[in-house]
């Protein structure tokens, strides 16, 4: 089954998933949204509002995170976890808040 993405381009499921992931990482300049490190090969997508807490796999609920940050955050509330980190940065917190949609921000 093909999946349509913007501009009418059709991709198979694997290609669509890869493109979806790459676009989010690219929009964040290939950097971890939390610690701002270069993602390199450790790129993951973190559900801002964890799936276990009702979060969806939607671009505005996903941010790139290095493997270390993603594992350490786990399903915790992102702001609470982020503010406890030595690398917390108000500018990055604002970027995350601007990225997530209002429904996600209210639920988090």
What are these regions (language model features)?
Residues 34-64, 76-80:
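Histidine-centered nuclease catalytic patch
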Residues 1-31, 90, 97-104:
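Short, charged surface segments at domain edges that flank catalytic/cofactor-binding sites
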Residues 21, 51, 70:
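Generic anion/oxyanion-binding catalytic loop in active/binding sites
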Residues 5, 52-53, 82-86:
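Solvent-exposed, flexible loop/coil residues
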Residues 60-61, 68-108:
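A detector for short metal-coordination/catalytic motifs
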């Amino acid at each position: 089954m093909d999946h349509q993405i913007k501009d009418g381009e059709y991709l198979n499921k694997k290609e669509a998933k890869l493109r979806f992931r790459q676009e989010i990482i690219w929009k964040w300049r290939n950097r971890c949204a939390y610690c701002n490190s270069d993602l390199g090969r450790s790129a993951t997508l973190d559900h801002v509002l964890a799936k276990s807490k009702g979060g969806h796999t939607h671009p505005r609920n996903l941010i790139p995170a290095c493997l270390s940050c993603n594992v350490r955050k786990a399903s915790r509330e992102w702001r609470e976890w982020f503010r406890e980190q030595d690398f917390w940065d108000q500018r990055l917190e604002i970027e995350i808040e601007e990225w997530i949609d209002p429904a996600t921000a209210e639920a988090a």
